[in-house]
Curated annotation (Swiss-Prot):
This is Transcriptional regulator MraZ. Forms oligomers. It comes from Staphylococcus aureus (strain NCTC 8325 / PS 47). One of its GO terms (cellular component) is cytoplasm. Belongs to the MraZ family.
Amino acid sequence: MFMGEYDHQLDTKGRMIIPSKFRYDLNERFIITRGLDKCLFGYTLDEWQQIEEKMKTLPMTKKDARKFMRMFFSGAVEVELDKQGRINIPQNLRKYANLTKECTVIGVSNRIEIWDRETWNDFYEESEESFEDIAEDLIDFDF
């Protein structure tokens, strides 16, 4: 399970260190792709297989299903950690998520998310105000 928030930087070659707490669970190779809210999603290979199976159940007769699958899968790439614990983020994904230098990597249960730091900070501030209301609307159990 992935959790936590870590600040890192992209180097000039588009490489970024993956937090050490995430590396063990991700293994040496994992998948990154376009996420929602202008971030990147990162999945273990096992989790990615489960997502693929779920996506196969989407009705191809629905235009939005086709559109979503095209965007999601066309952006997917398998990445490999180098000896320094870095991955190379392709230019098309850096552009999609507006990743330039300062990044934030967060753990979200079954995936990691890679954000432009300013975009993450804006999202966090906006969401922090409504966190309790969202919990009340969505969660039907105590924790």
